[in-house]
Amino acid sequence: MVIFMELSEAIAKRTSVRFYEEREVNDETLKELIKAAIRAPTASGLENWFFVAYKSKDIREKVYELIKQGHIEYFTGRGLPEEKMKKLLKRFEEGMYRAPLYLGVFINKNVRALQGEKYNELEFYFALESAAMAIENLMLKAVELGLGTCYIGVTCFEHIEKELKRMADLGDEYFLVGLITVGYPREEPKPKRRRKSAEDVLKIL
């Protein structure tokens, strides 16, 4: 598989994709995504990330229901009006977030450089930062391969994370950073313009 794209083009094209074709993401493509992810910077060289591919049909259906459940819980907590909640549920009926591949991105909290309770928070942040950079690498590689992705944060609700770990037979030392939907976009992705410019978010000293 030889596909090349300018990095600036991949960055510009990356956007959250929520609707996918039924076409499978094969194992070769999956491995290309993970290879890109693990080239990310990693604090203390620990590489304490771990990826779970929820890929079989039955497993994907269970994950999809967890995503739906998480969104209902999230928007209920935000006080979403009933009419808007109905629209959200209609989008799920239309297949929103139903993907041929879900990637769980975890960190292993037991893999660390600094020992001792006083460093727990710092080491946790280091691991999160490493995983976040790996996720961006993965997403940009996905653009190059003609795939779409979306970061699903609601799966980090404790009861949903627990179920995702149970499905993957992972112990308490693992922490879910996020779930990524992966697939071929149903429609041509249309990246949105950012509300803030580089000048708005930059301070030069």
Q: Which role fits each region the language model picked out?
A:
Residues 2-24, 28-32:
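Short acidic N-proximal helix/loop "leader" segments that mark the beginning
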Residues 9-10, 15-17, 175-205:
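C-terminal helix-cap and adjacent tail motif
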Residues 29, 56, 63, 161-163:
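Short Asp/Glu-rich motifs
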Residues 32-33, 37-38, 103, 109, ...:
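Small-aliphatic-rich amphipathic alpha-helix that forms the alpha element of a beta-alpha
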Residues 53-131:
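Glycine/small-residue-rich phosphate/adenosyl-binding loop
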